[in-house]
From Swiss-Prot:
First and last residue of the signal peptide: none
Taxon lineage: Eukaryota, Metazoa, Chordata, Craniata, Vertebrata
Further information: Most taste cells may be activated by a limited number of bitter compounds; individual taste cells can discriminate among bitter stimuli.
Extracellular side: 1-7, 62-88, 150-183, 256-264
Name of the protein in its database record: Taste receptor type 2 member 60
Chain ranges on the Cytoplasmic side, renumbered to this chain: 29-40, 110-128, 205-234, 286-318
Top-level taxon of origin: Eukaryota
Residues passing through the membrane, by range: 8-28, 41-61, 89-109, 129-149, 184-204, 235-255, 265-285
Length: 318
């Protein structure tokens, strides 16, 4: 899911590429519909009632940050497909890349803070620090949102600086994107600036996320042992809460893993830009992105209630 690598040009008018582009766009539409529902349902409640649960504030922010990038991807995919030999650092693509980097970074941080919230609120560790966090965490949600926007903006500016330097090098030396010297400039910037920057900015939220996931799995294991001893099993409310949270975190895990694999593959040059394998990989990633909001929708009680009301009103039942 690398915005920078969706801009280099080569002809891709063969039938397989066209089919994969169509599939990618359809998956984007599914992701747009799911994230739009989450954002609209919780956003309307926030506006009308002037209040929202802390967890739902994180969820609606995540839905909005996932909703917007899908339009960026659709716009960039359409542009690259129509203009496969377009200059990779022209103003249109640089503007789209800036939006992509900002929204992508925001998604990572919103997902991370939501996983922290699930872990602290649902896990039942008795350590004093953990109990203190459980009591204080809801008050910190606004700071989580502001820090996500601030960190995302900061890293996006750093990405923009790197891309701008490459653009200036192309202009200064009158190079073309397919020129050997031009490719070496881009490769140098990717290897020694963009790749390390991506590793740093993506490793921090991902490490926090997986720590929370491990803690939640540990807590679930303890509860399962107690539930089996009391013969309540999966009917135990605490076990059910753990399982629902785990389903949501698994959907996050798919996104985090796809981000890192995309980063490694692009850095290693395994999938050349606009190669057939590149579009296959993009389709797999956006399949994960399409499934993600669906899992979130069915793991959230409030969203399930809204969906049920929508289905009832559509069927004409009270």
């Amino acid at each position: 899911m690398n915005g920078d690598h969706m801009v280099l040009g080569s002809s891709m008018t063969d039938e397989k590429a066209i089919i994969l582009v169509i599939i990618l766009l359809l998956l984007c539409l599914v992701a747009i519909a799911g994230n739009c529902f989450i954002t609209a349902a919780l956003g309307m409640e926030w506006v009308l009632q002037r209040m929202l649960l802390p967890c739902d504030k994180l969820l609606v922010s995540l839905g909005a940050s996932r909703f917007c990038p899908q339009w960026v991807v659709m716009g960039k995919t359409t542009y690259v497909f129509l203009y496969p030999t377009a200059f990779p650092y022209n103003p249109v693509l640089r503007f789209l890349a800036f939006q992509w980097d900002l929204l992508n970074a925001a998604t990572l941080w919103f997902s991370t803070w939501l996983s922290v919230f699930y872990c602290v609120k649902i896990a039942t560790f008795t350590h004093p620090v953990f109990l203190w966090l459980k009591h204080k965490l809801s008050e910190w949600v606004p700071w989580m949102l502001f820090s996500s926007v601030g960190l995302s903006s900061f890293t996006t500016i750093l990405f923009f600086i790197g891309n701008h330097r490459v653009y200036q090098s192309y202009l200064r030396n009158h190079l073309q994107p397919w020129n050997v010297t031009g490719n070496s400039i881009w490769s140098y910037c990717e290897k020694f600036y963009l790749f390390p920057l991506k590793m740093i900015t993506w490793t921090m939220p991902t490490a926090v996320f997986f720590i929370c996931m491990i803690l939640l799995i540990t807590s679930l294991g303890r509860h399962m042992k107690k539930a089996l001893l009391t013969n309540s099993g999966f009917r135990d409310p605490s076990v059910q809460a753990h399982i629902k949270a785990m389903l949501a975190l698994l959907s996050f895990a798919m996104l985090f893993i796809s981000y890192f694999l995309s980063l490694v593959f692009s850095a290693a040059g395994i999938f050349p830009p606009l190669d057939f394998k590149f579009w296959v990989w993009e389709s797999v990633i956006y399949l994960c992105a399409a499934v993600h909001p669906i899992i979130l929708l069915f793991s959230n009680r409030r969203l399930r209630a809204v969906l049920k009301r929508c289905r009832s009103s559509r069927c004409g039942t009270p």
